[in-house]
């Protein structure tokens, strides 16, 4: 099975120059855990996870106790906290490669890029687990 058969193709991306407030809003409004960031040419530049974001924000953000410092933190640019030098895969790669990359690198998702490093999909450990569970259930029925 190829990655392209199970990857999420409808990507939600954000400019790496967007403020953290926009990254937070995007992660929350789409209920996603991984946000791919692009450069001015639309190429994959990095990623912010919900965990990365909350590590950099005060727990008082969005509450009545929010301070000026909290507000200033939200204006930082996404590229200031994004993960760079991402491990990626290509759509034609086998699913087995995805499993090994996720496991061996202790990561929870893989951006899928084309030959020009443009993000064309994303695959998470949950996507892989879903496929494996379906295959297991099929075997049980036979």
Give the label of every model feature segment.
Residues 14-32, 37-38, 88-106, 113, ...:
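The conserved cystathionine-beta-synthase
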Residues 27, 35-52, 102, 110-126:
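A glycine-centered beta-loop-beta connector
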Residues 59, 108-109:
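Glycine-centered flexibility motif
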Residues 1-10, 49-87, 99-103, 119, ...:
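Tandem CBS (Bateman) regulatory domains
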């Amino acid at each position: 099975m190829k990655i392209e058969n199970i990857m999420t193709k409808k990507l939600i991306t954000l400019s790496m120059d967007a403020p953290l407030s926009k990254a937070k809003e995007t992660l929350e409004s789409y209920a996603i855990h991984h946000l791919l960031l692009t450069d001015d040419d639309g190429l994959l530049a990095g990623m912010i996870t919900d965990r990365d974001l909350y590590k950099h924000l005060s727990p008082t953000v969005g509450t009545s106790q929010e301070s000026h410092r909290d507000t200033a933190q939200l204006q930082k640019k996404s590229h200031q906290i994004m993960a760079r030098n991402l491990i990626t895969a290509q759509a034609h790669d086998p699913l087995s490669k995805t499993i090994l990359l996720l496991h061996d690198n202790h990561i929870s998702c893989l951006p899928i890029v084309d030959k020009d490093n443009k993000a064309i999909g994303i695959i998470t450990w949950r996507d892989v687990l879903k496929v494996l569970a379906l295959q297991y259930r099929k075997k049980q029925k036979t």
